[in-house]
Amino acid sequence: MCIRDRFEGVIEQPEVDSLRVEMADLLDRAPVDNGSTVDKKGRPAFGQEFARPTFYLVEPLSDPWGGTEILNGRHPTKMNEPAPSSRVNEKVVFIMNGMCQTMPSGLRLYGHPDLLGIAASINGDDYVPYNDATFVKQPGVGGSVSWHQDGVTHWKSPDWDQGIHGFNFQVQLYDTGARSCLWVVPGTHKLGKIDIKRRLLEGSDSELMPDAVPLACNAGDVTVVNRQALHGSFANTSNDLRISLTFGF
């Protein structure tokens, strides 16, 4: 099962507009830092009633997971962390959780019949959801996600196959280019657990993985990526705003 594709214009403009409006409101009500109870205007921050934090903030243009044991240590290398072009003291929203409970438009998107039909065609009618996360890469400050494979649980399974860890949809709310979009190394979902450090060293660039390709998109496009595929994204030094609603099956 080779999944590294893009469906163009799946999400129609009225749906994109609704998602943009609700997302902008949430970002305006985000806490000023992880664990803070107030937003940048001094109001009570959104989402304090939920068991899981809605927002995860990072330093501008940083790589918060690379080279750490966070998320089961699946990001073994570190991306470059360029200095912001202007002095930015505040942390920035990087991840948002719980799209189904934070936005009515997010709940509708999760049940989009075309996307659920794609999920059934890949996994069969007995598929189940497992997670969602919205990646926010604001222009000139958005953080990076170092090279990784999403799967962590089934690498040694006696029933291992190329699709055992499932796949992710990413719904794009804005146009993205090479500096802001997701990058994927085609075919790596077939290789099992990859020695990511070694593979990066085999290339000629300290940050760009050999054979990686950009999944540049327009607003309303949906990418479909096997969770075993090697992928990552760079610090967003571009003028693009990238908001990618990510959910998998």
What are these regions (language model features)?
Residues 144-151, 230-233, 247:
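Histidine-centered catalytic micro-motifs
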Residues 147-166:
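Acidic, His- and aromatic-enriched active-site or binding-groove loops in soluble protein domains
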Residues 162-166, 171-234:
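Double-stranded beta-helix
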Residues 8-147, 153:
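Non-heme Fe(II)-dependent double-stranded beta-helix
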Residues 137-139, 187-192, 248-249:
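Short edge-strand/loop segments of extracellular domains
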Residues 1-5:
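Conserved small/polar residues in nucleotide/adenosyl-binding loops
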Residues 168-171, 240-249:
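A short hydrophobic beta-strand segment most commonly corresponding to one strand
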